[in-house]
């Protein structure tokens, strides 16, 4: 509610007496909705018709646990604990013989569960500027030490019980990927400035890898901070975070456009859940129905789904917003419409696509 703001709904001020954004600071996108002022860098893409907003995104019986909800988004398994990441399946479908060790790349530390699948190599880049150091690992003992490091990085994503076999299957490929990725900075020339934050760095690295034409089809990153969990001090903290993310994404888009590499990129960004309708005096607690964004030169911008009702009798238990778009519907559009894959097989069912492509 403080990201895409229902500024003309009287319940917004009722529910957010401490945290409501002043109306004269809101950036209108319709006569009912507006962006938080810190999202100003993204407004141009809305005006271009290249930014889609999916309102009320979530899933039935939404979990209020960060870890469980992230797992559900990662594995498309709301009813049971899944081990296979949906993007891990995408990487395998795109490259079933495993011929390209860089079909999928994570920008950040460790291996997010979304990318985890047995036998599927994924390189994780903490800092592309120093990633080439791995190319110097030559001796067998040093390579073994590196594989042990990969094991400790990847265990949280796939479980310690299967990590040894996973590393045996994927660790060597990941090291090969490191050798190749280390060449990307030398192919990149750009004057676009990025924020000097972790997110800015990850997206700059992402632009370099995309520019290098390694055949990478899945580029993934996660905001490297947990302070989007704004139970307190939300007014300042949320604004700073939105500014960082919006500016980083704007820099990335400007970069790949000036590089002539934007026609085959679609960005999908989301949070694993929304926030409670009512503020707690300083912040907001875990909620359900949230918002997701899709950005790219091939995106049909606009609003998709309905903004969750703020009527008191339409809120879920605890004062949470109802979801009205299943996140797997957005995945369906990305998989069928963008990647040309069988979404049903990957996400485990048929879901009505969201027509943003």
Language-model-detected regions and their locations in the chain:
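Histidine-centered active-site microenvironments of extracellular/periplasmic hydrolases
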Residues: 271-303
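Generic beta-strand/beta-sheet core signal
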Residues: 221-224, 268-270, 295
């Amino acid at each position: 509610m403080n990201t895409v703001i229902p500024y003309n709904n009287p319940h917004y001020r009722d529910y957010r007496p401490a945290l409501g954004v002043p109306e004269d600071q809101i950036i209108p996108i319709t006569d009912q909705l507006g962006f938080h002022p810190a999202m100003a860098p993204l407004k141009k893409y809305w005006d271009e018709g290249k930014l889609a907003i999916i309102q009320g995104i979530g899933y039935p019986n939404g979990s209020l646990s960060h870890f469980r909800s992230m797992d559900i988004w990662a594995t498309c398994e709301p009813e049971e604990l899944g081990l296979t990441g949906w993007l891990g399946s995408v990487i395998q479908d795109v490259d079933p013989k495993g011929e390209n060790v860089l079909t999928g790349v994570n920008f950040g530390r460790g291996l997010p569960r979304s990318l985890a699948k047995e036998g599927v190599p994924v390189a994780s880049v903490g800092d592309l500027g120093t990633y080439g150091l791995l190319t110097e690992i030559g001796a067998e003992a040093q390579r073994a030490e590196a594989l042990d490091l990969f094991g400790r990085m990847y265990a949280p994503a796939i479980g310690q019980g299967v990590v040894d076999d996973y590393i045996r299957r994927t660790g060597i490929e990941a090291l090969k990927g490191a050798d190749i990725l280390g060449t990307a900075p030398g192919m990149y020339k750009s004057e676009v400035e990025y924020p000097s934050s972790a997110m800015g760095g990850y997206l700059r690295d992402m632009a370099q890898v995309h520019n290098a034409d390694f055949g990478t089809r899945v580029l993934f990153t996660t905001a490297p901070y947990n302070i989007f969990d704004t139970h307190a001090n939300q007014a300042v903290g949320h604004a700073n975070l939105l500014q960082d993310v919006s500016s980083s994404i704007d820099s990335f888009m400007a970069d790949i456009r000036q590089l002539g590499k934007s026609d085959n990129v679609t960005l999908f960004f989301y949070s694993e859940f929304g926030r409670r309708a009512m503020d707690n005096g300083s912040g907001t607690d875990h909620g359900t129905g949230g918002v997701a964004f899709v950005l790219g030169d091939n995106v049909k911008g606009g609003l998709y789904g309905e903004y969750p009702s703020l009527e008191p009798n339409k809120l879920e238990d605890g004062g949470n917003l109802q979801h009205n778009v299943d996140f797997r519907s957005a995945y369906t559009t990305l998989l069928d419409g963008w990647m040309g894959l069988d979404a049903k097989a990957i996400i485990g069912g048929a879901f009505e696509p969201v027509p943003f492509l």
